[in-house]
């Protein structure tokens, strides 16, 4: 049993998003808290304070992680510390180049949200999204 330090943490690489999903504060541009990108130096400080107890790191909450230009650097940093990493994305920023960089970063798990099998259904959830681009 472990006391005092979390072994799982969920962080938000950014509050920004390229889509306008109706159920999300990021998509609605309706945050009631500070917004922006997680700074790499703050991220490293957080990991150093958590020490070697952290086992599982979720890079996601209410923004598109790939918008943060330092996202994959942070994943790589956590990976080198032996931390299991996971993220969720809308998939619009994935291309051959950053797909390769994502693999090389050591990201352990990626969830690509696809909410529908036709453009009409998909865009009812993922406003301004392009299903063809994601698939």
Identify what each model region corresponds to:
Residues 117:
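Flexible loop/hinge segments that line or gate small-molecule binding clefts
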Residues 112-114:
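Conserved phosphate-donor/acceptor-positioning beta-strand/loop module used by diverse small-molecule
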Residues 1-109, 120, 124-125, 129-132:
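Conserved alpha-helical substructure of the radical SAM core
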Residues 135:
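Conserved active-site region of classical short-chain dehydrogenase/reductase
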């Amino acid at each position: 049993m472990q006391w005092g330090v979390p072994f799982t943490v969920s962080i938000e690489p950014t509050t920004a998003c390229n889509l306008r999903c109706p159920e999300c504060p990021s998509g609605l541009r309706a945050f009631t808290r500070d917004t922006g990108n997680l700074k790499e130096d703050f991220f490293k400080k957080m990991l150093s304070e958590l020490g070697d107890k952290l086992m599982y790191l979720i890079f996601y909450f209410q923004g598109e992680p790939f918008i943060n230009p330092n996202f994959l650097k942070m994943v790589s940093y956590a990976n080198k510390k032996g931390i299991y990493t996971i993220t969720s994305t809308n998939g619009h920023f994935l291309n051959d180049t950053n797909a390769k960089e994502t693999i090389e970063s050591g990201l352990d798990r990626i969830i690509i949200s696809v909410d529908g099998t036709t453009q009409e259904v998909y865009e009812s959830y993922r406003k301004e999204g392009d299903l063809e681009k994601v698939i």
